[in-house]
Amino acid sequence: MLISTFVFLLYEVTALSTAIHVTKSYTHTRTGTSFFMYQKEAFYRGRSSTRQFNNTRSPSGRSASRSSNFSHRSSSRDSFSSNRSYSSSLSRSPEEPLRTILVENLTRNVTKEHIAEIFGIYGLIDHIFMPIYKKSELNKGYCYIEYVYHDQAANAVDKMNNAELDGEELFVSIKRFPFESLHKNHKHYENSYRPSRSQNNSHYNDKSFHRSRYSRARSRSPGSNISEYSDQSPPYHSYRHRP
């Protein structure tokens, strides 16, 4: 009886110790698992936080770089537009008055020397361009005259428009002509003529030259003057200017 009781108690003690050991091991295991889970959760939290930090930082960095690039581009565009507006304002600035006149309806007998002599009355001529035919070397019916001053060109238009030269009515107007292109095209530049300063000064300043060179003849209408060359000039070359 005692033996059976002792065996039963020993069995109970063994079972109790086993239960305590299992409980401790389960507790430790659970604690370790929870600690491991805690560390794992903390690790993933750290990675997510770093990812979140990087994700939140990288767009801002990109946006900052993009904004800086955009601001740089916008500033460059603004400077370009300002320069462009400045150049356009310069190009739109008031230009100088035109000093070039166009003389049309010339007879083929008229030469550049005749034009320089007649139109030199009204001012200092800087350049004359008269296109001519290569074979006949006669003019094509018009010429450009560039004066030194714009008021002289206006005076020539006022006096010589609708005037007669060699029996034909002239049509004189102020026009723009690209004289700079003549220097590039030498063939056309050969047809140009530039009076010397001595000729300009003598024709423009010496009024007695015109009085002796041209003789007053007859008047077709009241208030109009007809002047023609004297016997020293070719008989075909006569001109009548407006009063």
UniProtKB/Swiss-Prot annotation:
Q: Which SMART domains match?
A: RRM (SM00360)
Give the Gene Ontology MF terms in alphabetical order.
Answer: RNA binding
Query: Which keywords are on file for this protein?
Result: Cytoplasm, mRNA processing, mRNA splicing, Nucleus, RNA-binding
* Biased composition annotated in UniProt, kind: Polar residues: 193-203, 222-235
- Which compartments is it annotated to reside in? Cytoplasm; Nucleus
Q: Where is this region: Disordered?
A: 48-92, 189-243
User: Which Pfam families has this protein been placed in?
Assistant: RRM_1
**Disulfide bridge map:** none
UniProt subunit comment:
Component of the active spliceosome.
UniProt record similarity statement: Belongs to the splicing factor SR family.
Q: What is this protein called?
A: RNA-binding protein with serine-rich domain 1 homolog
